[in-house]
């Protein structure tokens, strides 16, 4: 994983989150109690921190929602057993829907993927709606083994994802996209 690979994500980099071995805080949200093991670090996410994450020394996560409630990426966190099949189905669906820029990253857990759909400066409400729509269309074609971020099921500060480990596949622009 290089710095250039991570630039594909356009992640919020004015702060980051470090995973702790213990619970950092407890929060009640929509009738549920959530326990957070990530501690917010109000320093810019730099290459040194990213390298420590890639080496496995620390676990770093990034926020998906910036301080102005805008979202750069809609992310599908796939936790199934067949990433190749999932990516193929998702790729076809995203092309059909007119999304031409998306990147799939491998996570620390083998077989799990983070599929970043690059939307750019999307309002939070629009991101929620697009995420639900994409998830519903995917669920019509295969068993649901993923979560979509950002999600309304979690507080804003819990809409974070671990930094990816390696690029699985990427797609940048295509002449056959119907929405060009």
Where are these regions (language model features)?
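Active-site-adjacent loop/helix surface patches within enzyme catalytic domains
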Residues: 75-78, 87-94, 99-106
């Amino acid at each position: 994983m290089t710095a250039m690979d991570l630039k594909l994500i356009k992640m919020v980099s004015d702060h980051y989150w470090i995973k702790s071995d213990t619970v950092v805080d407890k929060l009640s949200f929509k009738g549920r109690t959530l326990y957070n093991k990530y501690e917010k670090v109000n320093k810019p996410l730099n290459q040194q921190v990213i390298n420590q994450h890639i080496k496995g020394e620390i676990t770093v996560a990034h926020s998906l929602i910036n301080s102005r409630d805008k979202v750069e990426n809609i992310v599908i966190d796939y936790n199934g057993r067949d990433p190749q099949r999932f990516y193929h189905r998702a790729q076809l669906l995203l092309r059909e829907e007119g999304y031409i820029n998306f990147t799939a990253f491998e996570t620390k857990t083998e077989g799990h993927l983070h599929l970043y759909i690059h939307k750019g400066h999307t309002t939070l409400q629009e991101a929620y709606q697009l995420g639900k729509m994409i998830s519903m269309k995917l669920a019509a074609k295969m068993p649901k083994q993923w979560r979509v971020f950002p999600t309304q099921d979690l507080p804003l500060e819990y809409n974070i994802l671990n930094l990816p480990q390696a690029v699985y596949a990427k797609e940048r622009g295509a002449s056959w996209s119907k929405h060009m």
